[in-house]
From Swiss-Prot:
Tissue expression: Expressed in epithelial cells of the midgut.
Location of region: Important for IgE-binding: 52-90
Protein name: Major mite allergen Der p 23
Uses, biotech or industry: Non-allergenic peptides derived from the C-terminal IgE epitope-containing part might be used for immunotherapy to desensitize individuals with mite allergy.
Organism of provenance: Dermatophagoides pteronyssinus
Subcellular location: Secreted; Endoplasmic reticulum; Cytoplasmic vesicle
Amino acid sequence: MKFNIIIVFISLAILVHSSYAANDNDDDPTTTVHPTTTEQPDDKFECPSRFGYFADPKDPHKFYICSNWEAVHKDCPGNTRWNEDEETCT
């Protein structure tokens, strides 16, 4: 009985290791997909700080959320505009 349990654990360890090894191939190109709400403009927005909410300088109905220096372009709902002082659409 003890021998059977050891065999099961060894088999499981080999199976888990081989599945991780199969996914760890540096020769395969990888693609990372980042969801966005709207397309980035040609002149990409640069976050002025690591985290925060910032007005779109070209459109008062849009704004950017910066997280770890990455900008995500967002639309204000309805006919609202980005309010820089309140950091929300009003």
